[in-house]
């Protein structure tokens, strides 16, 4: 039975490519089927990039995918951490496959595929630090910040912040591949971006830079301090970015949350100041913006998995439109 399901999934993927696009000018990456998940189907593509270092791309198809419907698309940062606790650095995972499939089956969430965007390992912070805000840091502060980040990851030197190229990889390479290769709705209202910690910053940045692409940004445990300690300069440049780019006339919906334990204990006061910016920008709470606090929640995948259903329903719930 499992071999039949694998064959069926691969057939559906291949049939989703429009005939007019099946020519030698379009690169179709090698795709493997992984057996590490509990529900649905997980594919791993080797998609080369001109913007960032080459890495795997994970595409999870829910059990509903075989039913012939077009699906929404959720892009998620830190793809290494989403599906398999046996392969993660801390033995935890988001349990994305179990949670999304359950919500779809219970009619709480519209049919959705999940695209796992892998990070660059010890260069993750340089890929996931929003570039426009970073450019507004003073040179002395930025040098100290990124030197400390490089030292923490045992890098011999710092690297240029590369988040703009990471977003180009997502928007110009990954999304076109997903749109032409899978049965998806490709409009912005059917497209969301999600991440935690630095991935939360990048989700905010993605919708700010590409509001025509992403209709919803889901930002969990957003790492507003940017580095390893409290400071005023980094939250200030992020607040300025929100003021100028995260406005109701530009973006669809945006979700923030935070816990109160471990690293998340730093976030509450900063998030409240960001909420004031959103209020000043005329966002309407519980409509096009929401911020939630989770008492006792820590900065880890188990905590994010425990509340994952809430941002998913906010983005793609049956009554979310």
Where are each of the predicted segments found?
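Residue-level signal for mature regions of secreted extracellular proteins and peptides
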Residues: 8-9
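Positively charged n-region of N-terminal signal peptides that target proteins for export
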Residues: 1-4
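Non-catalytic cap/lid and distal C-terminal segments of serine-dependent acyl enzymes
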Residues: 20-321
